[in-house]
Amino acid sequence: MESGNIVNAQPKLSGIIDGSKSYMYEQLWKLCAGPLCDIPKLGENVYYFPQGNIELVQASTREELNELQPICDLPSKLQCRVIAIHLKVENNSDEIYAEITLMPDTTQVVIPTQSENRFRPLVNSFTKVLTASDTSAYGGFSVPKKHAIECLPPLDMSQPLPAQEILAIDLHDNQWRFRHNYRGTPQRHSLTTGWNEFITSKKLVKGDVIVFVRGETGELRVGIRRARHQQGNIPSSIVSIDCMRHGVIASAKHAFDNQCIFIVVYKPRSSQFIVSYDKFLDAVNNKFNVGSRFTMRFEGDDFSERRYFGTIIGVSDFSPHWKCSEWRSLEVQWDEFASFSRPNKVSPWEIEHLVPALNVPRSSLLKNKRLREVNEFGSSSSHLLPPILTQGQEIGQLSVASPMNISLRYRDTTEAAMNPSRLLMSYPVQPMPKLNYNNQMVTQIEENITTKAGTNFRLFGVTLDTPPMIKDPIKQIGSDISKLTERKKFGQSQTLRSPIEIQSKQFSSSRTCTKVQMQGVTIGRAVDLSVLNGYDQLILELEKLFDIKGQLQTRNQWKIAFTDSDGYEMLVGDDPWPEFCKMVKKILIYSKEEVKNLKSSKSLSS
């Protein structure tokens, strides 16, 4: 090929993704790219969006469009055919990227594609987020036992101190030698000698990810993935000075007018601007309207795939110069706060339409009522509300009502999102329940409580009640506790303590609860494993929390998984119950289809 981006329309085609790279290289590259990286297939019909390419190259997308669009009359999208794909890695930073060769509107060029039946060896792999200990100068790399057995060459466990030297190859074909040990108290797998040289050379820090891949022949590959805050838009060595000077639009315009191929650089974590033809049509046919609910996949700070829910609040052009373009045409509002920045305008193919569940019981909706205190960007909005409205309850955690607890009127966020006009309407709802000293939800006892008439006022059309005055609240709490103790006898004797001690105990016990998240349900729950005696009781409790009686026991529709302290996801049931309670950090309920997808991407261990 020539040095420029534009070459002859009939190049010599190899018919494979990258003939100079091995299958192991390809697998390692994809793992380093992450679960959300979507590379088109060779010979596939795609739509190319110049706006997205400019986003990758230039930080100021709109300014670049304003300067170049009057000169180059280029459509907002080009229908192309994928001619070649080269998976590459930047020499200095180890940033991975793909060079994708496209041909506009080419139907006459025959592309020899890969055989679908070609031999694909089995590979084992694992990824781990580096800890402070992993990156310290005097430590080593701690390998989880399961991954050490599956992905590293086997040790001779008959030796008093099993150890051996292993050889791993990175994406630059550089060889790295590590000493694999199994020792310590308790014994654990670790990489010591050679590890410090590796992290120093790669400039790895806490939060980065290490990737190991091992093939059937024993070949071991190693790669890295840098944390989000360390990644720039695009390495300067990738984009030539000539390309930056003439701009992406000029290159695409020349290829479009002359029917010749052009090369674009695609980088993982960037918005998808090369979209398969079928995926684009499916997205457009979904007809996303204002008020439609959707879910979108993101990569979290721990490099795991997460889904966030939102509502479409507008449909408009992202740039005034590119009329009727689907690129970032949907203005969205997110349901919940995230620790990383999310776009307020997305493209239709980036999201999935969320069909509302019409058969959800009313009792389930009542459980989901809460007061939202944090806006999309995480800034507190409590300065807009009176003090009585800033005592919200965080989902998935238990909160304790103080002696001066008040009843609040709060909104159903699910109903409000589906019908924005109701945001300015007031309607009565059930008061928030309080917690008794045994962490059981009870109805507020109103006997023997003398109140003063409160004053009603309105804020944004919502009627608010001033808190009633309670006479002698400490005495009242003691009376309430006595009545509850007589009503329900516990398995072990309990000594009544002062209200301050009881409230302290409530906060302490709330930390023993485990967060539960169900696919398709925005609001999470919490379950106390210490009061359960096994998996059967856990299943019954989860069914009760999400109002899906009998659906978890059959396991035909839903599967239960969990994450451990290392962040790995596994299906429940394989570990003894006491051991499961010690290592579980979060419980997840996935659909059967989602479990299959996670297993295929090796994000979930069976």
UniProtKB/Swiss-Prot annotation:
It is found in: Nucleus. Keywords: Auxin signaling pathway, DNA-binding, Nucleus, Transcription, Transcription regulation. The keyword NAD does not apply. GO terms for molecular function: DNA binding; DNA-binding transcription factor activity. One of its GO terms (cellular component) is nucleus. Residues 511-592 form the PB1 domain. Pfam families: ARF_AD, AUX_IAA, B3. PROSITE patterns: B3, PB1. InterPro entries: ARF_dom (IPR010525), ARF_plant (IPR044835), AUX/IAA_dom (IPR033389), B3_DNA-bd (IPR003340), DNA-bd_pseudobarrel_sf (IPR015300), PB1-like (IPR053793). One of its GO terms (biological process) is regulation of DNA-templated transcription. Residues 126-228 bind DNA. Homodimers and heterodimers. Auxin response factors (ARFs) are transcriptional factors that bind specifically to the DNA sequence 5'-TGTCTC-3' found in the auxin-responsive promoter elements (AuxREs). Could act as transcriptional activator or repressor. Formation of heterodimers with Aux/IAA proteins may alter their ability to modulate early auxin response genes expression. Belongs to the ARF family. Interactions between auxin response factors (ARFs) and Aux/IAA proteins occur through their C-terminal dimerization domains III and IV. This is Putative auxin response factor 21. The gene is ARF21.
